[in-house]
């Protein structure tokens, strides 16, 4: 799916034009209302600076939190505007509302190279309903549209899809373009062998991804809490480990599908057990056929780490989505950290394309200080999963074709 991108527009297209840019500024705040991680804001800077440098008038639209269609003072974009001003080195004005007379007056008074941030679009329930009248009001601020919010591209909302009915051209920003290049590229035309490492606690949240990846991958490694559903489906005792009883047949089907397709499906052969779910729990290493009693598995074991590392060393493209264990507890973070280090090394020394597909794996890689060493770190959680599942993202489909 080739879409028109911002890189195809130059100063002749952009100078003096009001450009509505959908960005993903849904960043975490602490109790004092301070931003604790500005990754998503920094990720939008290349697109914003390109527009500023080409003398456009930049109007940013973003959501923050889940205000449920009402104004929530704790979910205003004030701290975001302040941080963005620092990163850009220029003042960023903020409206009181994303639509209405005050917002229109501010967008109409912009000079070339100015940046304006519209207040939280989710203060209006019409945003998530993709209400076209609301979308038209948003679109009335601008002459053209750029979507750079990959993290919201799987939503058919007014600011991601509806506005494209009223603004042309509607193009992909640099972040969205990069996300599609890596994630779509890994799925559609990877350098092989292609491996996927899928972790996390529940099979249910990764069914679509696993099923889709079985059609595309040469190897799949499974870790995290979901492995115990596979073990129980095989008839093994898993002690008090997390199991989704209603997904046992599905686990059997996925193993059978892998075998039928000739995909190497690797599950851990040993695990790190704990006597309780706690950072200070008593722990021990056990083979998967020796789990019993009150013990629960919270990480993959050292033998499994080596097997996974050897399998990954043979690959040219690797997608990682989901941790290998409860990495938030240092005692049970070895599996996740080992995978992160392995991918960083393969990326640096063997020119392997390493893609970290959103969510907890990103947090794990950042916690390990290895983010800079990966080929690509996705900014989307649900959007990454849906793209890897082979789904069409509404926010992407709505853009002009290249």
Curated annotation (Swiss-Prot):
Catalytic activity from the UniProt record: (2R)-3-phosphoglycerate + ATP = (2R)-3-phospho-glyceroyl phosphate + ADP
Presence of the UniProt keyword Secreted in the record: no
A family per Pfam: PGK
Localization per Swiss-Prot or TrEMBL: Cytoplasm
Residues the record lists as binding substrate: 24-26, 40, 63-66, 122, 155
Class of the enzyme per the UniProt entry, highest EC level: transferase
Signal peptide: none
Keyword Kinase annotated: yes
Entry keyword set: ATP-binding, Cytoplasm, Glycolysis, Kinase, Nucleotide-binding, Transferase
Family matches, as InterPro entries: Phosphoglycerate_kinase, Phosphoglycerate_kinase_CS, Phosphoglycerate_kinase_N, Phosphoglycerate_kinase_sf
GO molecular function, one term: phosphoglycerate kinase activity
Pathway(s) of this molecule: Carbohydrate degradation; glycolysis; pyruvate from D-glyceraldehyde 3-phosphate: step 2/5
Sites where the protein binds ATP: 206, 297, 328, 358-361
Enzyme Commission designation: 2.7.2.3
PROSITE patterns: PGLYCERATE_KINASE (PS00111)
PANTHER family referenced in this protein's UniProt entry, alphabetically: PHOSPHOGLYCERATE KINASE, PHOSPHOGLYCERATE KINASE 1, CHLOROPLASTIC-RELATED
Subunit structure: Monomer.
Family stated for the protein in its record: Belongs to the phosphoglycerate kinase family.
Record's protein name: Phosphoglycerate kinase
Organism this protein belongs to: Prochlorococcus marinus (strain MIT 9301)
């Amino acid at each position: 799916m080739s879409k028109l991108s911002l890189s195809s527009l130059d100063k002749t297209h952009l100078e003096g034009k009001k450009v509505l840019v959908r960005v993903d500024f849904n960043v975490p705040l602490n109790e004092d209302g301070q931003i604790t991680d500005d990754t998503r804001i920094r990720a939008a800077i290349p697109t914003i600076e390109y527009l500023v440098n080409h003398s456009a008038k930049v109007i940013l639209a973003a959501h923050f939190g889940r205000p449920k269609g009402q104004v929530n003072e704790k979910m205003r974009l004030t701290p975001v505007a302040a941080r963005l001003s620092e990163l850009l080195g220029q003042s960023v004005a903020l409206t009181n509302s994303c639509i209405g007379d005050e917002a229109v007056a501010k967008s109409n008074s912009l000079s070339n190279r100015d940046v304006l941030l519209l207040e939280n679009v989710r203060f209006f329930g019409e945003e998530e309903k993709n209400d076209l009248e609301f979308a038209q009001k948003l679109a009335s601020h601008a002459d053209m549209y750029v979507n750079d919010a990959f993290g919201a591209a799987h939503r058919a909302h007014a600011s991601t899809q509806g506005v494209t009915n009223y603004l042309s051209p509607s193009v992909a920003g640099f972040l969205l373009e990069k996300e599609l290049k890596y994630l779509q590229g890994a799925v559609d035309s990877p350098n092989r062998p292609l491996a996927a490492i899928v972790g996390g606690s529940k099979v249910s949240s990764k069914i679509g991804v696993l099923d889709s990846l079985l059609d595309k991958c040469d190897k799949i490694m499974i870790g995290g809490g979901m492995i115990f559903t596979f073990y129980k489906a095989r008839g093994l005792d898993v002690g008090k480990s997390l199991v989704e009883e209603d997904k046992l047949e599905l686990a059997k089907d996925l193993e059978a599908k892998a075998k039928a397709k000739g995909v190497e499906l690797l599950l851990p052969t040993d695990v790190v057990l704990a006597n309780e779910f706690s950072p200070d729990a008593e722990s021990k290493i056990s083979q998967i056929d020796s789990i019993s009693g009150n013990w629960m598995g919270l990480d993959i074991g050292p033998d499994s780490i080596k097997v996974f590392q050897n399998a990954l060393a043979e690959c040219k493209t690797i997608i990682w989505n989901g941790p290998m264990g409860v990495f938030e507890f240092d005692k049970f973070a070895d599996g996740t950290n080992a995978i992160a280090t392995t991918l960083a090394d393969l990326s640096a020394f063997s020119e392997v394309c390493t893609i970290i597909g959103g969510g907890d794996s990103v947090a794990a890689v950042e916690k390990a200080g290895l983010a800079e060493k990966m080929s690509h770190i996705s900014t989307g959680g649900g959007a990454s999963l849906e793209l890897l599942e082979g789904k069409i993202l509404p926010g992407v489909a709505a853009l002009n074709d290249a």
